[in-house]
A protein has these predicted regions:
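Thiamine diphosphate
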Residues: 1-47
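Flexible, active-site-adjacent loop/turn segments at secondary-structure boundaries
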Residues: 10-17, 58, 83, 90
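Glycine-rich ThDP/TPP pyrophosphate-binding loop and its adjacent helix/strand module
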Residues: 39-50, 60-76, 80-186
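Active-site metal-binding loops of divalent metal-dependent hydrolases
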Residues: 54-56
């Protein structure tokens, strides 16, 4: 996730890199950690490896995400989908809904918003046969936490887990922040 300092000063170890490299970077970290454990350089323990990416990062980082799925790394890919490249002023992504207005898909006499259907990333990840795939909405936090706990268990025991959330962006969606829960639920 690309944010400015100090908002990335988390209280856990993290790597902040280009958003298209998340799955490749985390795959390498997982493999390096596993080798260190095999050589007894790190004690065995419970560590959860999580990649956080937006739908734009999954668009341009899809190759490395599919590679991580192929290798079935014990990690979680968490995608928050707000329907566009929001860090660049709401350019359309493959997750932008059909007909939506963005800075690169206009509405008017000659243009009708985004002209093609969105990519179904959960279905794409399901086609890789990874152990766990779930979709959640930020408007339902109990379901979100339940599925996140399950993703952690699957990542630890079986391999790659993919979790996608529909996430609101009031600024670029043109909604009021207090209406986002009802917008997501709709």
């Amino acid at each position: 996730v690309t944010t400015s300092y100090p908002k990335t000063s988390f209280k856990v170890p993290y790597v902040h890199n280009l958003f298209q490299n998340g799955a490749a970077t985390l795959s390498g970290i997982v493999e390096a950690f596993n080798q260190k454990v095999k050589r007894h350089e790190y004690p065995e323990g419970e560590i959860t490896f999580i990649m956080v990416s937006g739908d734009g990062g999954m668009d341009i980082g899809m190759g490395s995400a599919l590679g991580a799925a192929l290798r079935n790394h014990h990690m979680i890919i968490f995608e928050y989908d707000n329907g566009g490249y929001m860090n660049t002023g709401y350019q359309l992504s493959y997750s932008t809904p059909l007909g939506a207005k963005s800075s690169t898909s206009h509405l008017g006499q000659d243009q009708f918003g985004k002209s093609f259907f969105n990519k179904d990333m959960p279905a794409i990840m399901a086609a890789t046969n990874i152990p766990y795939i779930a979709t959640v909405a930020e408007s339902n936090p109990i379901d979100f936490v339940r599925k996140a706990i399950k993703a952690k268990a699957y990542a630890k025991e079986f391999g790659l887990a993919y979790l996608r959330t529909l996430s609101a962006c009031p600024l670029n969606w043109g909604d009021q922040p207090n209406l986002e829960k009802s917008v997501i639920e709709a």
